[in-house]
């Protein structure tokens, strides 16, 4: 969930927002002028509010000048962010700064420079200042980036305790069953939007595994739309614009948040009143307490369940879809993955088990290589609260400090044949293997994703089932380009061809 696909057409977000809110009459024009002025003042305060001077004698990172006031490099970056960053790396080295929309971003490229961000303390490089205004309206108050970091760390520890191997063993059969039922509607052959299908399936499987059977049983088309509206809160407009604007997407997000919370409250209260103890994550949270002995409130449990689902939904759905296209492009590799199913699980392909899943090494490497070339989140960010020194430069407070997994995971200094999809590269020595932060699709350090192991279980189970059901092909050789206009870098026009395997 990152900014930085921001404003491809300069002020387009502002313009579109105002078009949604206002009409064409005189009153509307006046309201537009007032709102636009307020937004400019708001953005200006956001831009300069945290800036502080450097200590005497400190050297600033190289700064990429732009003649365009305020917008800076937003247009060029928005059109081709990876190319922009790789060109800057070649010219300026691993640390450099530039301005977009009145904010200064300092990028740390390469493992050594990235270590500053991943090894930092929250009081020095702060995550809440970057992410809270985006996540709090979606997850709710009192959880995640809306609370002091020590409290958030306690909440993550509670969630992580529920993401254990005992639960994963249960999840495999649940995910396999959901996947088979979902693809019954696909028939024998056809062409479908793979990303849309997998996004729906990821929600179904994650809700069943992570929320429990009570909440999953209520997941109908209406509730699925509520999730989509809530997920729509992760947008460039939500990052850039003040939350009080009456945008339709903001209203849909807030309504969905209230309605989903009400569904969760009923399930939570029913579970609290029940004498039955079900071994799942919902029960884990209900039984958890903070260090001071205080139990979680219903509102905290509901917010954490929303966060657990939506934070992982993007990673799993995007990665699953991209891997499908990589396998469709390389039919030999796809067939090897299918044959691995028979080798590991048996010729008759019985129901999957967690232990078998662990032995699907080729499929595991395919996921790993997909995450290398197409990490869902292009940039991880922190707000500098204190001066930070790296590679001989000092980053002042107020800069947004960034690491790009996408760039780090394809640097030619670290990766051999860096743009090739080659799952077998992990069987050999790579320069990157000796670099701690050359491969970070799930982050690292204090903010490493706690759902990484569940994501692997989910994706491996779904794709094991899909490979048993179908063969996949590109349509007329089309391999999707990356859609950089969205917060998560999804495949563009992700339609794939499929045919049911013969028995």
From Swiss-Prot:
<keyword id="KW-0560">Oxidoreductase</keyword>
<dbReference type="InterPro" id="IPR036396">
    <property type="entry name" value="Cyt_P450_sf"/>
</dbReference>
<dbReference type="GO" id="GO:0005789">
    <property type="term" value="C:endoplasmic reticulum membrane"/>
</dbReference>
<keyword id="KW-0479">Metal-binding</keyword>
<keyword id="KW-0153">Cholesterol metabolism</keyword>
<dbReference type="InterPro" id="IPR002403">
    <property type="entry name" value="Cyt_P450_E_grp-IV"/>
</dbReference>
<keyword id="KW-0756">Sterol biosynthesis</keyword>
<comment type="function">
    <text>Sterol 14alpha-demethylase that plays a critical role in the cholesterol biosynthesis pathway, being cholesterol the major sterol component in mammalian membranes as well as a precursor for bile acid and steroid hormone synthesis.</text>
</comment>
<dbReference type="GO" id="GO:0016491">
    <property type="term" value="F:oxidoreductase activity"/>
</dbReference>
<keyword id="KW-0443">Lipid metabolism</keyword>
<keyword id="KW-1133">Transmembrane helix</keyword>
<feature type="transmembrane region" description="Helical">
    <location>
        <begin position="24"/>
        <end position="44"/>
    </location>
</feature>
<keyword id="KW-0408">Iron</keyword>
<keyword id="KW-0492">Microsome</keyword>
<keyword id="KW-0152">Cholesterol biosynthesis</keyword>
<feature type="binding site" description="axial binding residue">
    <location>
        <position position="449"/>
    </location>
    <ligand>
        <name>heme</name>
    </ligand>
</feature>
<dbReference type="InterPro" id="IPR017972">
    <property type="entry name" value="Cyt_P450_CS"/>
</dbReference>
<dbReference type="InterPro" id="IPR050529">
    <property type="entry name" value="CYP450_sterol_14alpha_dmase"/>
</dbReference>
<dbReference type="InterPro" id="IPR001128">
    <property type="entry name" value="Cyt_P450"/>
</dbReference>
<keyword id="KW-1207">Sterol metabolism</keyword>
<keyword id="KW-0752">Steroid biosynthesis</keyword>
<dbReference type="GO" id="GO:0033488">
    <property type="term" value="P:cholesterol biosynthetic process via 24,25-dihydrolanosterol"/>
</dbReference>
<keyword id="KW-0349">Heme</keyword>
<keyword id="KW-0812">Transmembrane</keyword>
<dbReference type="GO" id="GO:0008398">
    <property type="term" value="F:sterol 14-demethylase activity"/>
</dbReference>
<keyword id="KW-0256">Endoplasmic reticulum</keyword>
<comment type="pathway">
    <text>Steroid biosynthesis; zymosterol biosynthesis; zymosterol from lanosterol: step 1/6.</text>
</comment>
<dbReference type="GO" id="GO:0020037">
    <property type="term" value="F:heme binding"/>
</dbReference>
<keyword id="KW-0444">Lipid biosynthesis</keyword>
<keyword id="KW-0472">Membrane</keyword>
<keyword id="KW-0503">Monooxygenase</keyword>
<keyword id="KW-0753">Steroid metabolism</keyword>
<comment type="similarity">
    <text>Belongs to the cytochrome P450 family.</text>
</comment>
<dbReference type="Pfam" id="PF00067">
    <property type="entry name" value="p450"/>
</dbReference>
<keyword id="KW-0832">Ubl conjugation</keyword>
<protein>
    <recommendedName>
        <fullName>Lanosterol 14-alpha demethylase</fullName>
        <ecNumber>1.14.14.154</ecNumber>
    </recommendedName>
</protein>
<dbReference type="GO" id="GO:0005506">
    <property type="term" value="F:iron ion binding"/>
</dbReference>
